[in-house]
Amino acid sequence: MDKTDQTAIDESALVLNRTEKSAEAVLRVASMALSITGLVIMIKNSISNEFGSVSYSNIGAFMYLVSANGVCAAYSLLSALAILALPCPISKVQVRTLFLLDQVVTYVVLAAGAVSAETVYLAYYGNIPITWSSACDSYGSFCHNALISVVFTFVVSLLYMLLSLISSYRLFTRFEAP
């Protein structure tokens, strides 16, 4: 192989690395935007009627959802900037750190979505054996907005599952096991 062939291989690896970094940054920015959307919908979600008033701050699961979406949005922004700013090639410590933090954010957001989905389910359908009736008959728009926020949160968790796969692939294919 002559020097020209080696240069072509190095340049194609650099382009692939830039493409990989750009795609990952786009996924992180998209998850940030969706997290903020879910967070804003839930924060603005309140209703008052003859039965009383309710807002997200009255329900622990929804407060956790707002917190998890806020943490995810902040981490998504910081990690997208870090991905774009990291030198090529990135070190093993940087790859492991991204992998670990991606895993943590994935599970935090997934847990927030799951507990909030259970709360929304109970609000829509109640629990007949213990005589809980549906709350959404009285607070329809609140339930609808909560459901939309939960859907956004699950989409974010899917994006973070994909990002976790990318970071695990990067870690386990490019570096030896610890």
From Swiss-Prot:
One of the GO BP terms on file: floral organ abscission
Matches recorded under InterPro entries: CASP/CASPL, CASP_dom
Source organism superkingdom: Eukaryota
Residue ranges crossing the lipid bilayer per the database entry: 23-43, 70-90, 97-117, 146-166
Expression sites (tissue/organ): Mostly expressed in flowers and buds and, to a lower extent, in roots and yellow siliques. Localized in the floral organ abscission zone.
Membrane-topology descriptor: Multi-pass membrane protein
Cytoplasmic side: 1-22, 91-96, 167-178
Name the UniProt record assigns to this protein: CASP-like protein 2A2
